[in-house]
């Protein structure tokens, strides 16, 4: 690591987003990972998808080993000017109305549970009455 820290702006770092020129921001530090693109176990797409933003969460979510963290030092090129990094937006779910289940099917089922046995009983009585021999 160089003794003098170079401070880079977010705009400058975000322009390095290609396979042949790839810089990442991880924990406030800027890394030129271009030489590592072919060697990265996850492939270059993983690294490219983390450009143009603070890749700290992407890096930490994978759970890199201590060896991987030590390897990063040789790709270190400077610090990011935190005032130039856009604020990360947190996901806000769209507001949805409360679930209002239609009670009609439940009501109809209760009515049918009451009426069907009565109709069967009534039909049985009618059939008995007409089939009764006098």
From Swiss-Prot:
- Residue ranges of every copy of the Cytochrome b5 heme-binding domain listed in the record: 5-81
Localization, UniProt: Endoplasmic reticulum membrane; Microsome membrane
Keyword Secreted (UniProt): no
This protein's GO cellular component annotations are: endoplasmic reticulum membrane
Which membrane topology describes this protein?
Single-pass membrane protein
Q: Which UniProt keywords apply?
A: Electron transport, Endoplasmic reticulum, Heme, Iron, Membrane, Metal-binding, Microsome, Transmembrane, Transmembrane helix, Transport
Transmembrane residue ranges: 107-127
Q: Which residues form a coiled coil?
A: none
Alphabetically, the GO molecular function entries are:
heme binding; metal ion binding
PROSITE patterns on file: CYTOCHROME_B5_1, CYTOCHROME_B5_2
InterPro entries this protein is in? Cyt_B5-like_heme/steroid-bd, Cyt_B5-like_heme/steroid_sf, Cyt_B5_heme-BS, Cytochrome_b5
- Recorded family membership: Belongs to the cytochrome b5 family.
Q: Quote the protein name from its UniProt record.
A: Cytochrome b5
Lineage of the source organism?
Eukaryota, Viridiplantae, Streptophyta, Embryophyta, Tracheophyta
């Amino acid at each position: 690591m160089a003794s003098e820290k170079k401070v880079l702006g977010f705009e400058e770092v975000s322009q390095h987003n290609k396979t042949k020129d790839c810089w990442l921001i991880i924990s406030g530090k800027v890394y030129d990972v271009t030489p590592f693109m072919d060697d990265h176990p996850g492939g270059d797409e993983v690294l490219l998808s983390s450009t143009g933003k603070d890749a700290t969460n992407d890096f930490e979510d994978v759970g890199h080993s201590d060896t991987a963290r030590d390897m990063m030092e040789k790709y270190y090129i400077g610090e990011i000017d935190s005032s130039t990094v856009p604020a990360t937006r947190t996901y806000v779910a769209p507001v949805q109305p409360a679930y209002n289940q239609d009670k009609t099917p439940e009501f109809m089922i209760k009515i049918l549970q009451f009426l069907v046995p009565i109709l069967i009983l009534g039909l049985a009585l009618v059939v008995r009455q007409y089939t009764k021999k006098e």
